[in-house]
Design a protein with these regions (language model features):
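Hydrophobic beta-strand scaffold residues
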Residues: 49, 140-141, 169, 198, ...
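Phosphate-binding site of ATP-dependent enzymes
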Residues: 212-305, 326, 331-333
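ATP-grasp fold ATP-binding core
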Residues: 162-163, 190-211, 232-243
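Basic phosphate/pyrophosphate-binding loop/patch that engages nucleotide-derived ligands
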Residues: 161-169, 226, 245
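ATP-dependent carboxylate activation and anion-phosphoryl transfer catalytic cores
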Residues: 2-3, 8-16, 20-24, 44, ...
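Glycine-rich phosphate-binding loop of ATP-grasp-fold ATP-dependent ligases
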Residues: 31, 170-174, 197-223, 245-247, ...
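ATP-binding N-terminal substructure of ATP-dependent carboxylate-amine bond-forming enzymes
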Residues: 2-147, 151-157, 164, 175-188, ...
Length: 379
C-alpha cells in the first residue's frame, strides 16, 4: 500500500504493479519474453498491473496486457516493444508516483503505483539506472538497489568485490577503452598471462551477447572488437577446463538469511560446451538443464552456501541467480551473480525454485511482497 493513501487503508484491495520491460540494451527482446511470462503468472487476486514498454530508442510507451501476454519466440523471431504506441509517463506525487498514458495534450488512465517490477536486462535497467529513477520517484521496486545493481552489472567490479569478501573466482583481465585504444599490444600481453581458452566478454553485458571463446592469440583482437560492439570495456576470463557450470537461485527473505535453491547444471552438448545466446533462448538447442544437479551432498551445500554469501556480500535484495564452476575435486568458485536473471517460465531461475516446490506464480508473488515490505530510501 502506498504510504499516505488514506482512501485505501483497511480495504482489501489489490496492490498496483508497474511492469517495465524492453529497454535500450542488446537484451531488449529477452526482457520482452520475461515480461510476457511474468504477466501470465501474476496473481490477479492480489495485483493489478500497468504495462510500460521501453522501445529500443528509449521511448516509454503504454502497452496493453494482451500484447504483452502474446510475447513469444515465433520461428526464431523475438518480440520487441512497438515504439509507435502512445507515450507513457511517470508523475511524482506526494505519496509516490503515478503512471499515465499520453493522449494529445492530455494524460489518461492515470494510476498510482504501489510497486514496480523492472524486467530489464543489461545496461539502463539492471545496472542501477532505473533503480535510481524509482528511488527518486518514491516507488518501491523488486530486486537489488542502486549500488548492488551497478556493481553486479559490471563483471570487473563484481569480481573485485568477490576478492574483497574472500569469495573465490577465476583469473581475469579487464581491458578498458583507453587501454585498448592507446596500447592494444600491452593488453594482449596481459591477456596472454592467462591460460587459454579465453572468454572475451562485454564487461557490462548479458545473455551471452558479444561473447567469444578464443583458443589462439591471433583471434583475440577480433573477439575484443566483437565485445566492444556491446561495451567499450571488455573482460577476458580464463577458461575453466574440466569444471561443470552449476547455477543456484537465491531469494531474499523478510526475516533471517536469504534462501538458496538446490543447484542446477547446464549441460551443453557441443564440442565447445559454450552456453551461448542460441542455446539459452532458442528452441531445439543441444542443451539440458539438469535440476537438481547430480552432485554429492557436500558439494551441493558448498554451492548453496557460496551463493548466499555472494548475495549478502554484494548487498543484493530480492533475487539473484548465482553462477558457479564445480571442479572434479569438489572445489567451487564463483563465475558471476545476476540480479535480474532470465525469468520466463522455462528460465533457470524459476525452474530451480519450481523444483523445490515454489511455483512460478508464488515466486512472482514473493518477490512483489518483498518489495512492498521494504522501506523507501537508503538502506
Amino acid at each position: 500500500m502506498v504510504e499516505g493513501d488514506e482512501t485505501r487503508k483497511g480495504q482489501n484491495v489489490r496492490s498496483r504493479v508497474l511492469l517495465v520491460f524492453g529497454g535500450a540494451s542488446s537484451e531488449h527482446e529477452i526482457s520482452c519474453l520475461t515480461a510476457g511470462g511474468v504477466l501470465r503468472a501474476l496473481d490477479r487476486e492480489r495485483f493489478d498491473v500497468t504495462c510500460v514498454g521501453i522501445a529500443k530508442g528509449g521511448r516509454w510507451v503504454a502497452v496493453d496486457e494482451e500484447m504483452v501476454t502474446s510475447y513469444a519466440i515465433v520461428d526464431a523471431s523475438l518480440p520487441t516493444v512497438d515504439a509507435s504506441l502512445p507515450d507513457a509517463v511517470l508523475i511524482r506525487t506526494a505519496s509516490g508516483a503515478d503512471v499515465a498514458r499520453v493522449d494529445g495534450d492530455s494524460l489518461v488512465g492515470r494510476t498510482p503505483i504501489d510497486v514496480a517490477f523492472a524486467l530489464l536486462h543489461g545496461p539502463f535497467g539492471e545496472d542501477g539506472t532505473i533503480q535510481g529513477l524509482f528511488e527518486m520517484m518514491g516507488v518501491r521496486y523488486v530486486g537489488a538497489g542502486v549500488l548492488s545493481s551497478a556493481v553486479c552489472q559490471d563483471k570487473g567490479a563484481m569480481k573485485q568485490q568477490f576478492a574483497v569478501h574472500d569469495l573465490p573466482t577465476g583469473p581475469y583481465v579487464i581491458v578498458t577503452d583507453a587501454q585498448w585504444t592507446s596500447d592494444p599490444d600491452a593488453c594482449l600481453s596481459r591477456i596472454g598471462e592467462l591460460e587459454a581458452p579465453w572468454f572475451v566478454k562485454p564487461a557490462r553485458g548479458g545473455s551471452s551477447m558479444g561473447i567469444t571463446r578464443v583458443t589462439t592469440t591471433v583471434d583475440l583482437p577480433a573477439a575484443i572488437a566483437q565485445a566492444r560492439c556491446f561495451d567499450p570495456q571488455v573482460i577476458v576470463e580464463q577458461g575453466v577446463v574440466g569444471a561443470r557450470e552449476v547455477e543456484c537461485a537465491v531469494l531474499g527473505s523478510l526475516v533471517g538469511a536469504p534462501l538458496a535453491s538446490l543447484p542446477g547444471e547446464i549441460d551443453v552438448h557441443t564440442e565447445s560446451r559454450f552456453y551461448d545466446f542460441a542455446t539459452k533462448y532458442l528452441p531445439d538447442q543441444p542443451v539440458d538443464l539438469v535440476i537438481p544437479a547430480d552432485l554429492p551432498d557436500d558439494v551441493i551445500e558448498r554451492v548453496r552456501e557460496l551463493a548466499v554469501r555472494a548475495f549478502v556480500a554484494l548487498g543484493v535484495e530480492g533475487l539473484a541467480r548465482v553462477d558457479t564452476f564445480v571442479f572434479p575435486d569438489g572445489t567451487v568458485i564463483l563465475n558471476e551473480l545476476n540480479t535480474m536473471p532470465g525469468f520466463t517460465a522455462t528460465s533457470m531461475y524459476p525452474k530451480l525454485w519450481d523444483a523445490v516446490g515454489v511455483a512460478y506464480t508464488e515466486l512472482v508473488t514473493r518477490l512483489l511482497d518483498l518489495a512492498l515490505a521494504r522501506p523507501l530510501g537508503p538502506r
